[in-house]
Amino acid sequence: MYKIKFTLFFYVLLSFSFIGKSAYAANDNINSLANSYANLVSHYYNEVSLSTQEMHNAIIKFVQAPDNNSLTNAKNKWIAARSIYGITEAFRFYGGPIDGVNKYGEEGPEGLINAWPLNEAYIDYVKGSPNAGIINNLTLEINNNTIIAANMSEDDADVSSGWHAIEFLLWGQDFSLETAGIREASDYLPTNEINIRRRAYLVATSALLLEHINWLSMEWLENGEGRKAFLNKNDPGGAILTGIATLAGFELSSERIATALDSGDPEDEHSCFSDQTHNDVKANFNGIINVYLGKGLNGESFRPSISEFVAKNNIKLHENILEIINETNISINNITVPFDKMLSEPKNGPGRQAAEKTVSNLLVLAKNFKEAGKDLNWEVIIAE
């Protein structure tokens, strides 16, 4: 994950405003922007697919030979894949393949991939309830159909699949402000029926996540249905800005940071078992930046970008966006790690203040994105 260097970005983006009209004209149209964005999305989903495959391979190796080393490796692969997936959440909220409904009436897989918060007892044993969850319910066969059917079947917190189900199965419950959950590798030794079911559940959930990620990757390939649908949108610029404005102005600021700040409950943090919520926040924010600037995972350039259109149309607004991006980057990096430790701080604690500042900055950023859309005659809707 690269870090934001504001001065560099500022002068690179500012230079776009001085590109001659003849040089810019070739790319100064909405079709070029839509294709560039589709290439960016495809790039990231391909990267997530590769990293999720690595995680799945590590999980299989762990289950085959459960010990602390193989468990740690599986956890590290989860963190690596998760950090890239978080960037792709900037591709949500406008009816795309991830969370929209396609022409066949089929809903995207987002709820099976990233639903949270998660009721741990719905899946497996928890403190005080040693026989809880699907894993301990011997009447249920552990397979894809069971996991999919169980996901949020009666309550939104009854999450059975996706990143956070895997996270819980790898880390277990987190009872400490200093460390993440500490599940024992011995939970996966094939010494009893429940452990065997737990092994099967972890592998099945990981395979299901990989299947959904691979599907998303294929949707955005050159001839993918999701890509075609996006390129046929009447207002692709508005869709792109809606995605990053909603992530900034609602999902990340409100749902993922402010809700936890208001409740003070670690259960409201995004990746509470692994203590990776701070990286979730950074990944989501990087997704917003990368869409705006047209940047790939390793700094690849996808042009034209939204930022070029904004800068050419309203350089002052573009400068304001870059400034608030820089300020938000600073406030995010000042949030206490781990996130649950920050939640335990008093209201005037430095980590809490940084989190509050991040929320307010993200709201300003979303407002600026919406203003940019209005200036460009694109419809930007901040979904809630």
For the regions a protein language model found, what residue spans apply to each?
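Positively charged n-region of N-terminal signal peptides that target proteins for export
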Residues: 1-5
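Bacterial N-terminal signal peptides
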Residues: 7-18
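Sec/Tat signal peptide C-region and signal peptidase I cleavage site
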Residues: 19-25
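Mature extracytoplasmic or organellar-lumen-exposed domains after removal of signal/transit peptides
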Residues: 26-384
